[in-house]
From Swiss-Prot:
Top-level taxon: Bacteria
Organism annotation: Streptomyces scabiei (strain 87.22)
Descriptive protein name: Mycothiol acetyltransferase
GO molecular-function terms, A-Z: mycothiol synthase activity
Residues annotated as transmembrane: none
Residues annotated as domain N-acetyltransferase: 15-152, 165-308
Keywords, comma-separated and alphabetical: Acyltransferase, Repeat, Transferase
Residues annotated for 1D-myo-inositol 2-(L-cysteinylamino)-2-deoxy-alpha-D-glucopyranoside binding in this entry: E47, E192, K231, E240, Y278
Complex formation: Monomer.
Gene Ontology terms describing biological process: mycothiol biosynthetic process
Family annotation (HAMAP family): MshD
């Protein structure tokens, strides 16, 4: 279906909402995202959002395509899978077509599609995105920090694991179910991460960057109690603390710090000069741990929401 069913003359703005995209539409969206990223310095749509462009329809996911004439000039993705929070969205307008109200049109369409219950990411927190949020009547409620540190001088003490805990690399296929269960427990308070499914895991295992040698699992006996999944961004020469998780029963004993150190040592050994990670600004304990490991804030992503 479309959010504007009225026939319009060539050159008029048109927004179409779809549960899935054709191959040609996916290619056009990916090209739009890449061209915008070259100008903005970061992707307007998260890794999860880009993965959701692949395969077939995704439950709870809708795609909004904004065209002018035959040209795709804007894109938004709306995901409504959180049982508590409002639907979440990301949107982008091609740099050559900004300043013509397309962002406001996409934002208004998202509000209509979501029943005016909406959360929207502004990656990098650019002033134009902040202005658009204000125009749409959205308020800031979440800050996600990207933190970085140099790995060229990274020389930590040997990580100390809690008694009875051993660490080994992830084995694809064999460890999938155990990791998904541990991830769900470790991030029960964080649905974006804790709700990952086998399909989500398979998507990531199919990415060129996936390397099980950098996916560390901590066991106490046969129980998976913690993990650190690292990610190498080869083109940017960045190593990422992709996700660190510790099951509730194993928290408080230093396992998270030990796993973080193990992963950072692995990234440094790959010759990557810089490490990065994402952490919610209001997670004071985690921010403190990372600051003690030498991380500093590099940039901040902002999430806005409607008050309806």
């Amino acid at each position: 279906m479309t959010s504007d069913d009225t026939a319009q003359p060539s050159g008029a703005r048109r927004i179409e909402t779809r549960p899935d995209l054709t191959a040609a539409q996916k290619d056009a969206v990916l090209a739009l995202l890449d061209e915008a990223a070259q100008v903005d310095g970061q992707q307007a749509v998260s890794e999860q959002g880009r993965l959701q462009l692949r395969g077939g329809p995704r439950e709870g996911v809708r795609h909004l395509l904004l065209s002018v004439g035959e040209d795709l000039v804007g894109y938004a993705q709306l995901e409504d899978n959180d049982p508590v929070e409002a639907p979440a969205a990301e949107l982008v307008v091609h740099p050559s077509h900004r300043g013509h109200g397309h962002g406001r049109a996409l934002g208004s369409a998202l509000l209509a599609e979501s029943g005016k219950r909406l959360r929207v990411w502004a990656h990098g927190g650019h002033s134009a995105a902040r202005h658009l949020a204000q125009v749409l009547g959205l308020t800031l409620f979440r800050e996600l920090r990207q933190m970085r540190r140099s790995l060229t001088d990274f020389d930590p003490a040997e990580p100390v694991l809690p008694e009875g805990v051993t660490v080994r690399a992830f084995v694809p296929g064999e460890d999938d179910a155990a990791w998904l269960a541990a991830n769900a427990e470790a991030f029960a308070h964080h649905p974006e991460q804790g709700s990952l499914t086998q399909r989500d895991l398979d998507d990531r295992k199919g990415e060129p960057w996936f390397d099980p040698a950098g996916f560390f699992l901590a066991f106490r006996g046969e129980e998976l109690v913690g993990f650190h999944w690292t990610k190498a961004h080869a083109a940017e020469q960045l190593g990422e603390v992709y996700v660190v998780g510790v099951r509730p029963g194993a928290q408080g004993g230093g396992l998270g710090k030990a796993l973080t150190t193990i992963g950072l040592r692995h990234l440094a050994a790959q010759g990557l000069p810089t490490a990065m990670l994402y952490v919610d600004a209001d997670n004071k304990a985690a921010v403190t741990v990372y600051e003690r490991l030498g991380f500093v804030t590099y940039e901040t992503d902002l999430m806005y929401r409607s008050e309806t």
